[in-house]
């Protein structure tokens, strides 16, 4: 799994369909944001961690979709790393029946069949009023970005790089998609528009771009809003 430098101690692991931010607390201690697909990304993610001799200190989760939380429980068990996610998404993540809340078109039987790997129990819950979370003395900002899912959040690394999860997707993803994935359209539109008022040196889109130019970010926000 390739590792891209974003800025400072912030990196992004290139998973099968997403960028997974990695923040280096030290040369060996890291925080991972989102975990990719269970089947597609587990081997590569494990190899990346082990080959670099990293100690996984925490997992931060943007939301409970299978391409983001597919390896949380596995990483909790393998490395003893605590996982944090927003209150709403923590409840959704507990078991396949509750996970279905983010995939309402699926039957209960189908959700139990395909979502066993994606379910986990959060070690820390991020509440709606929380604007940060501290990991080993490093402060990560929390961005409230609901809409794509009910409790979707983003994170700002101590370097100031903003991970916006699925609040925005890149132009290639927009062009390739048949329909937008938005659970609450009005909130999603508000969250996308709210990013205009932010000013970070880098924005990491899970799917699948790093943006450092303000004009490019503005154009991408326009495209995402138009797509909805």
Predicted regions and their residues:
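Short Gly/Pro-enriched turn/cap motifs at secondary-structure boundaries
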Residues: 12-13, 123-124, 144-146
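Conserved beta-strand hairpin/beta-sheet module of binuclear metal-dependent hydrolase folds
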Residues: 1-52, 154-165
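Short catalytic-loop micro-motif centered on adjacent basic/acidic residues
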Residues: 31-34, 58-61, 142-144
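Active-site HxH/HxHxD metal-binding segment of metal-dependent hydrolases
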Residues: 37, 42-43, 47-132
């Amino acid at each position: 799994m390739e590792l891209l430098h974003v800025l400072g101690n912030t990196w992004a692991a290139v998973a099968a369909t997403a960028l997974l931010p990695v923040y280096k607390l030290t040369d060996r201690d890291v925080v991972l944001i989102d975990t990719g697909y269970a089947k597609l990304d587990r081997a590569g993610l494990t190899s990346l961690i082990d080959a670099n001799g990293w100690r996984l200190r925490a997992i931060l989760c943007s939301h409970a979709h299978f391409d983001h939380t597919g390896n949380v429980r596995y990483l909790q068990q393998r490395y003893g790393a605590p996982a944090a996610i927003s209150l709403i998404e923590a409840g959704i993540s507990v078991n396949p029946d509750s996970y279905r809340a983010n995939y309402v078109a699926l039957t209960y039987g189908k959700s139990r069949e395909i979502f066993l790997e994606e379910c986990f129990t959060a070690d820390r819950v991020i509440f709606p009023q929380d604007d940060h979370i501290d990991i080993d003395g490093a402060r990560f900002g929390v961005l409230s970005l609901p809409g794509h899912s009910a409790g979707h959040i983003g994170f700002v690394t101590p370097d100031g790089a903003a991970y916006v999860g699925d609040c925005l997707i890149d132009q290639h993803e927009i062009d390739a998609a048949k329909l937008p994935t938005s659970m609450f359209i009005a909130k999603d539109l508000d969250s996308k528009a709210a990013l205009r008022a932010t000013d970070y040196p880098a924005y990491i889109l899970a799917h699948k771009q790093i943006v450092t130019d303000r004009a490019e970010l503005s154009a991408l926000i326009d495209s995402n809003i138009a797509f909805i």
